[in-house]
UniProtKB/Swiss-Prot annotation:
Part of the 50S ribosomal subunit. Forms a cluster with proteins L3 and L19. In the 70S ribosome, L14 and L19 interact and together make contacts with the 16S rRNA in bridges B5 and B8. Belongs to the universal ribosomal protein uL14 family. Keywords: Ribonucleoprotein, Ribosomal protein, RNA-binding, rRNA-binding. This is Large ribosomal subunit protein uL14. GO terms for cellular component: cytosolic large ribosomal subunit. The gene is rplN.
Length: 122
């Protein structure tokens, strides 16, 4: 459950290390984002020489949340950290690698490139 001002780890190799959520996309009154939702975020920490710099405003998709997410079959999924993948043009990831597991909800929301790059889909 991601909301405004939430800090997230970055799960790709774009060079960013930490994001700060600015807005949850999808409606004017939308408050929370879960796995597979797109947010607008600011890069708060980045490594030198990366494709994104500190202070850049980017779109990102949430791939892991600490708050449990209920699935249709009644099971719950939760992770140890909040993490996101930075998006480039369209719904494609800006980086070429994804680190750590991602939720199966990304497949339902048609982020196929992220699902194929991820080492594990839970």
């Amino acid at each position: 459950m991601i909301q405004q001002e939430t800090r997230l780890h970055v799960a790709d190799n774009t060079g960013a290390k930490e994001l700060l959520a600015i807005r949850v996309l999808g409606g004017s009154k939308r408050r929370y984002a879960g796995i597979g939702d797109v947010i607008v975020a600011s890069v708060k920490d980045a490594i030198p020489g990366g494709s994104v710099k500190k202070g850049d405003v980017v779109k990102a998709v949430v791939v892991r949340t600490v708050k449990e997410h209920r699935r249709v079959d009644g099971s719950y999924i939760k992770f140890d950290e909040n993490a996101a993948v930075i998006l480039g043009s369209g719904r494609e990831p800006k980086g070429t690698r994804i680190f750590g597991p991602v939720g199966r909800e990304l497949r339902d929301k048609r982020f196929m490139k992220i699902v194929s790059l991820a080492p594990e889909v839970i």
